Structure formats: C-alpha cells, structure tokens
Swiss-Prot record:
Protein name (Swiss-Prot/TrEMBL): Potassium-transporting ATPase KdpC subunit
Organism lineage string: Bacteria, Pseudomonadati, Pseudomonadota, Gammaproteobacteria, Pseudomonadales
Organism of derivation: Pseudomonas entomophila (strain L48)
Gene Ontology molecular functions: ATP binding; P-type potassium transmembrane transporter activity
Listed GO CC annotations: plasma membrane
Lineage: superkingdom: Bacteria
C-alpha cells in the first residue's frame, strides 16, 4: 500500500505547488509585463491621477450635465452584477421602463432609445450606442452651456468602432472628456 500512497501524495503536493503557486504567479507576471493596464482592471484615472472607475464597468451619473449610462439591475455594484432576467412580455419590465422614461427623460423629445431604458446582460455594460448618446446631447449641452456641435465632436472622438459589431461609446470616457471641455464645478 505504501507503494501507492507515497507517489499519490507526492503528485498531489507537486500539482498543488505547480497549479496553486507557480502557474498563477507566471500568468500574473506575464500579464503585468504584456498587458499592465488590462491586468490591473482597465482603471480610468482623472487628470490628477485619481482612479475614477474602470473602462469595463458602468457607473451611475446623476444630473443633466452628464451623459447617463444604461440602467443597472444591480445598482452598478460589481458584486450584484446581473441582468434583470425579465422577459419582454413581463409587466414588471414594462412598468419599470415606463417609470424610468417618465422620471429621467420626460422633458426630451421623441421616443427614448431602448439602450437608455433596458439593462444589459451583465447589468454593468459601460457602452451605449451613439444614438443613445445623441438623444442626450441637447440636455447635456444646455446644462453645460456648450454648443451641441462641440459636444458632437467629443462624441465622435469617444466612439469606438470595433472590427465586429456596431459602434459604441464608453460613457465614463465621454464624461471625462466632457468635464475637461466644460467643467461642471465652474458653473
């Protein structure tokens, strides 16, 4: 029996060291060298170097002077990241969409883009389609006292055009550019 136990325990110890320590350390080291920004969470910093969020996680922006993100089913908390899991035919979803549209977008003209009223699959998608940003442009321009044309330049610069899929705008990056152009604190 010792002939079987000793090699088995040796293998367990060896694999524990390799897969529990050496492999994770090697992957972390390679990631830090090859992709330091992504390995550390794609953190977004302001002009003072302070972390303002991650380029991969949506944030809530309140007030007319900011472009709004998609709604979040988990209150923008990464721990509670999830979709609402409500089907399009669910009356609770219809009521929430109706309430959100009335509360946030009642003063604006035309139908509210779907992306501004529905949560994403993760509940934390940081991107919006350019149409959803364009819908918010008049409100933000009025609040910041900046022309819509100047804001449209910011939107065009912030629009990502992936190889596959439609163009999207990272709301955090756009709001940071907006703050550099026309700081809200100065108003």
């Amino acid at each position: 029996m010792t002939a079987y136990v000793r090699p088995a325990l040796s293998l367990i110890l060896l694999m524990t060291v390799v897969t529990g320590a050496l492999y994770p350390l090697a992957v972390t080291g390679i990631a830090q060298v090859a992709f330091p920004k992504q390995a550390n969470g794609s953190l977004v910093r302001d002009d003072r170097g302070e972390v303002r969020g991650s380029a991969l996680i949506a944030q809530e922006f309140k007030g007319d002077g900011w472009f709004q993100s998609r709604p979040s089913a988990g209150a923008y908390a990464t721990v509670a990241s999830s979709a609402s899991n409500l089907s399009p035919s669910n009356p609770a979803l219809a009521e929430r969409v109706k309430t959100d549209a009335a509360a946030q977008y009642q003063a604006q003209q035309g139908p509210v883009p779907q992306a501004l009223l529905t949560t994403s699959g993760s509940g934390l998608d940081p991107h919006l389609p350019p149409e959803a940003i364009a819908y918010q442009l008049p409100r933000v321009a009025a609040a910041r006292q900046v022309s819509e044309e100047r804001l449209q330049v910011l939107v065009n610069d912030a629009t990502l055009r992936p190889l596959i899929g439609p163009p999207v705008v990272n709301v955090l990056a756009l709001n940071q550019a907006l703050e550099r152009l026309a700081p809200l604190a100065a108003r």
